[in-house]
């Protein structure tokens, strides 16, 4: 009986150690790439927002000009549909431990903004041995 208890105690110890170790296997932590809107409160008369993307990782990242917007409605995020839209071709690079400010146009001719909470969504690529795509979001308020 003592051997069985010892076996299970050791088994749980090693399993918990392996699970804790696996959490640290990710090369880039979830908060190593951060985006924010500056300033985060704007008037509805604004034509664009400025996003500041911070690359706190150990790898260079890149992103295109494409972005999405969502509005917070009825306690959930709802996509804003701009319909068919062409995007300027281009790639922005952000070196490790650096940041970059980009403009995101609100495209008011395609959507009528009302005061409320919004967020911008961009996709970045982390340029490590195997490229990793990551979604980053930043909230802002239109008054």
Which positions does each model-derived feature cover?
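Alpha-helix boundary/interfacial micro-motifs
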Residues: 13-15, 72-74, 107, 114-115, ...
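Primarily secretory-pathway and cell-envelope proteins
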Residues: 19-82, 124, 129-143
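Bacterial Sec-dependent N-terminal signal peptides
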Residues: 1-25, 118
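Short, solvent-exposed, Trp/other aromatic-anchored flexible loops in extracytoplasmic proteins
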Residues: 83-117, 123-127
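A generic structural micro-environment signature
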Residues: 7, 39-43, 59, 67, ...
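Residue-level signal for functionally critical sites in structured catalytic/ligand-binding pockets
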Residues: 2-4, 61-63, 115
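Intrinsic disorder/low-structure terminal segments
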Residues: 6-7, 11-16, 53, 81, ...
